[in-house]
Design a protein with these regions (language model features):
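Short, solvent-exposed loop/turn segments at conserved positions within beta-propeller repeat blades
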Residues: 245-247
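Conserved "HGTGT" condensation-loop signature of ketosynthase/thiolase-family condensing enzymes
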Residues: 1-229, 236-242, 251-364, 371-476
């Protein structure tokens, strides 16, 4: 799945730095220093302690021991930082993917009108199969019908009249984004007709209108989730055209951003999640990843719709869902799976909004968790509807970064060396208040500075390796 959860393996934490190694370095340093002192002692014997000859030698010995311990601590810090960086990037990547997949708008109100008025009731088996020999192909059977733009304007007026009262109740004024997708080709005439209908009684909003072609993918829906917090009104319909034999349908969905509702209002409302790219050739893997994204609770029963799938995936949907142990509504459709092309008709790309409208209407019969699988000529998508907010970042916990012991020791040695040079070349400055202030300022800067610099360098060198691992983790 193009938005599947990354599977980058985390690395095991490195073992903590060992005090025994530090003790060994100290003993080895003292022993080495003692050997050097004996080898370099004058022929007359070792100098006395009161002579002062031991002071610089002792200083150099402890400086060497400190340098070796600093190198060991820095090496351990680099290893620990690499592991910490890697694991944090893994968790951050998973969280980012989940946050992206969990984007949704709340369906505040909807209208779904099908030419076959008994479609949903038959799917839930509350009405017997009594379809007439001649299928009903048009909406509003009591009104006159003129194919073309006149029919579009007629159905649009009816659809807007149905949805506008609920919009006014929730959102009486303000900016509103409107998406119109129809089966017609003359978008300019549709635009003129839409503005006539809309301006007749819906002038309270500042509208931004998007007319979409009939063959536009449902994946384009994602841009409207990501771009703004404006409410969105989707109007999708297939209206009668000359020489057209497909049954008409019309659907309207008024959706708002979760921030527009208080907690009690948005608790059990229906949510429409972003469309997820789907590879129907590996349907089992794709549906497994869709389940793992936890858009809907795994324990809840699901209803699955599909349209446009090739023969092999279409015939294997039920089997794959059973193998994945996805609980289904056995009493709806065919064991919880609805082939929209068979029970209704195939609308190609327009089937996306047709199924979403039908699924929103179906929620009134009980199914709140629904998956919609749609394949077109060039791509395929999976859309999820649910009435529960997804759990985001359930594996997100704070792991403190490794202690910068090596950086601190390096900073101490660096400042000690610089101060020694200052004493050698500028003794008056070194023992003055300005020299002490300069030393303190250097300590303040180098203590955090070296730690930050080491982490930045480590991350910069390690990032290409992580990117390669992410690309080979099954991501497209």
């Amino acid at each position: 799945m193009g938005w599947s959860l990354p599977k980058i393996p985390e690395k095991e934490m490195v073992s903590s730095w060992s005090p025994w190694v530090c003790l060994f370095i100290i003993i080895l340093g003292l022993f080495t220093g003692l050997i050097v002192a004996v080898l370099k002692s004058p022929a007359a014997g070792l100098p006395s302690l009161s002579s002062g000859a031991w002071l610089p030698f002792t200083a150099w010995t402890f400086a060497g021991i400190s340098a070796v311990i600093a190198v060991y601590s820095t090496w351990w810090e680099i290893l620990a930082t690499r592991v910490w960086n890697w694991n944090e990037w893994c968790r951050s990547t998973r969280l980012k993917w989940c946050l992206g997949a969990h984007q949704y708008l709340i369906i505040h109100s909807h209208v779904f009108i099908a030419a076959d008025t008994g479609l949903l009731s038959r799917l839930v088996h509350t009405q017997e199969e009594d379809r007439a020999d001649t299928a009903v192909l048009t909406l509003l059977p009591g009104e006159s019908l003129t194919p073309g733009i006149s029919r579009f304007e007629q159905l649009l007026s009816h659809l807007i009249a149905q949805i506008i009262p609920s919009i006014r109740l929730r959102y009486p004024s303000g900016p509103l984004r409107i998406i119109v997708q129809t089966s017609g080709r003359d978008k300019e005439s549709e635009s003129h007709a839409f503005h006539r209908v809309w301006s007749a009684g819906s002038s309270s909003w500042i509208v931004e209108i998007h007319f979409q072609d009939a063959d536009l993918s449902i994946g384009c829906w994602n841009q409207f989730i990501e771009s703004t917090k404006w409410p969105v009104l989707v109007l999708a319909l297939h209206y009668r055209l000359p020489d057209d034999v497909l049954p008409e349908f019309a659907t309207a969905l008024f959706m708002v951003h979760p921030s527009m509702l208080n907690q009690s209002e948005g608790k059990n409302t229906l949510r429409l999640f972003r469309a997820m790219p789907l590879n129907t050739r590996t349907l089992a893997t794709e549906l497994s990843e869709l389940r793992d994204m936890a858009l809907t609770p795994a324990s809840r029963k699901h209803l699955v719709w599909h349209s446009g799938l090739p023969d092999a995936p279409r015939q294997s949907v039920s089997r794959v869902l059973n193998e994945l142990s996805v609980p289904l509504y056995d009493d709806i459709g065919t064991g919880g799976v609805i082939d929209y092309d068979r029970v209704c008709v195939r609308y190609d790309r327009l089937a996306g909004w047709a199924m979403i409208g039908a699924a929103a209407e179906m929620a009134a019969y009980g199914p709140a968790c629904q998956w919609l699988l749609l394949e077109g000529k060039d791509d395929a998508w999976a859309v999820t509807l649910g009435n529960a907010a997804p759990a985001v970042g359930s594996d997100r916990f704070v792991i403190p970064p490794p202690f910068p012991g090596g950086s601190v020791l390096m900073a101490l040695l660096l400042n000690a060396g610089l101060y020694s040079l200052m004493i050698s070349y500028f003794p008056s400055t070194a023992f003055s208040w300005s020299g002490i202030a300069l030393l303190l300022l250097s300590l303040i800067v180098t203590f955090p500075g070296l730690a930050i610099l080491l982490r930045r360098i480590t991350a910069r060198l390690q990032r290409p390796e992580f990117i390669r691992a992410a690309r080979h983790s099954g991501k497209e």
